[in-house]
Every structure is written in structure tokens, then in C-alpha cells.
């Protein structure tokens, strides 16, 4: 869709990114999967690692089709982007550029908000969703577009044989109902972790949160130590010396 709307065939993606295994999505990723196919890349792809890379690419390319990026890189190692990246992309959008946010991994509460774009305060032109939309019970994906893109699309013909499968739609609807019913979006437990060897601690925002975690772990057979009066929001993880790998795996 982005290629069709822009009329250009140059894509930009982030370092270590992964966006899928179809021809276009694989080629718009920083992965070696496309090397297994003896198929000519249908578009030119440029990759950036940091803000300086992205600035250079945006200045040097006047015929970019789109930028595709994950709010937090998933399969490529789980790391976030600097705030400068999002500032640059906002400027790119202001000049008519299209930014696609791949929320296949980060969507539906993985970052503490319903979607990653809320966490990073960024409004993409297109959002890719999957996995969490059905809580993993059925294969399902979705592509959301903003009003600017919607006005440019006369007819959307990029369908697949099983697009809109009723079982997938039912699973997605029930998942969304449960998220709303349990108010999962607002049940956040934000903790700061510290670790030195096998010694670890998690600092929660309130003593109530830490005690809730300790109580639940004890129900599961694990004894965690809560903090003293000065650190009442902390949960300490101090495992004993393991006699073998199996005990270690069980504790994990």
C-alpha cells in the first residue's frame, strides 16, 4: 500500500529488524532470510542503526517509499530507539513521508500501554498488528491506517484467501472483550530491576504491589523476601546454591 501510494520503491528499516517472511516484508527487514530465495528484490532497502544514520538517509533519498520500524525491536534483540529517532520520523511525516509501525510484538499491552505508539508518543501512518490480537489462540493479523492514508486508498485489494476468517475474528473479539473487562491496560506494575550474579531485586511503585507479587509467588511454592521499612517496595530474589542444572531451570 505504501509503495502504491508513494509511487516509489525505496524502503527504510531499522538495524536488526524483522517484519515477516513474505517477499516484501522479508526484504524490508534486516535479516538474511531473503538470501534463501533466488528472487530479485522488488525494492531497494536502506537500513539505519541510529539517529545519525536515519538523518543521512532521509537527507540523501528524495524518493523514499516508507520507513518501517518497531517501537521496540523484538526478534532482533529487544532494544528501544532513542527519542531522536522519533523526532526525525515526525519531521519526515510532516514532509509527506509514510511511517509504518510494526506492532506485531509490542501491541496489546506488551509495553505497559495498549500499543507501543502510545508509549513513545508517536502517531504512525500505518500499524501492523498480530499475535496478541487473538492472544495467540488463532492466526490473525491486521493493518490499520490513518485518515491520510484512507483518503488515498480508493479500493483495498490486498486480500488473502483466509483474510477475515470468522474463527480468527471471533478469537480477536473475545480477546479484546477480556482486555476491556479485566482493565488490563491500566493494571500496570512498573518495576526497576537490579541484579548482581544470583542476587536480584525488583522495586515496585507501591508496597501493595510488591506484597501482591510475594503472596502470589508463595502460593506457587516460591519464597521471596520483601524489603525492610526503608525499601518496602522492593522484592528480593536470593536463590540458594543449586546442586545441578535441573534445580536451576526449575527455579527459573
Locations of regions flagged by a protein language model:
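Conserved N-terminal phosphate-binding loop of PLP-dependent enzymes in the Aspartate aminotransferase
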Residues: 1-252
Amino acid at each position: 500500500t505504501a509503495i502504491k501510494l508513494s509511487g516509489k520503491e525505496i524502503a527504510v528499516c531499522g538495524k536488526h529488524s524483522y517484519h515477516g517472511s513474505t517477499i516484501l516484508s522479508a526484504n524490508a527487514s534486516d535479516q538474511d532470510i531473503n538470501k534463501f530465495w533466488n528472487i530479485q528484490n522488488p525494492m531497494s532497502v536502506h537500513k539505519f542503526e541510529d539517529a545519525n544514520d536515519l538523518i543521512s538517509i532521509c537527507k540523501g533519498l528524495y524518493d523514499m517509499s516508507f520507513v518501517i520500524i518497531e517501537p521496540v525491536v523484538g526478534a532482533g534483540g529487544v532494544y528501544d530507539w532513542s527519542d531522536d529517532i522519533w523526532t526525525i520520523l515526525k519531521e519526515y511525516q510532516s514532509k509527506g513521508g509514510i511511517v509504518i509501525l510494526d506492532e506485531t510484538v509490542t501491541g496489546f499491552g506488551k509495553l505497559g500501554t495498549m500499543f507501543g505508539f502510545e508509549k513513545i508518543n508517536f502517531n504512525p501512518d500505518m500499524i501492523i498488528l498480530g499475535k496478541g490480537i487473538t492472544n495467540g489462540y488463532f492466526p490473525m493479523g491486521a493493518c490499520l491506517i490513518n485518515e491520510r492514508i484512507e483518503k488515498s486508498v480508493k479500493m483495498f485489494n490486498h486480500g488473502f484467501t483466509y483474510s477475515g476468517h470468522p474463527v480468527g475474528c471471533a478469537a480477536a473479539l473475545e480477546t479484546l472483550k477480556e482486555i476491556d473487562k479485566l482493565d488490563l491496560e491500566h493494571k500496570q506494575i512498573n518495576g526497576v530491576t537490579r541484579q548482581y550474579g544470583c542476587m536480584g531485586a525488583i522495586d515496585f511503585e507501591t508496597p501493595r504491589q510488591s506484597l501482591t507479587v510475594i503472596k502470589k509467588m508463595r502460593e506457587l511454592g516460591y519464597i521471596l523476601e520483601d524489603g525492610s521499612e526503608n525499601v518496602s517496595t522492593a522484592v528480593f530474589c536470593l536463590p540458594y546454591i543449586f546442586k545441578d542444572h535441573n534445580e536451576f531451570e526449575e527455579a527459573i
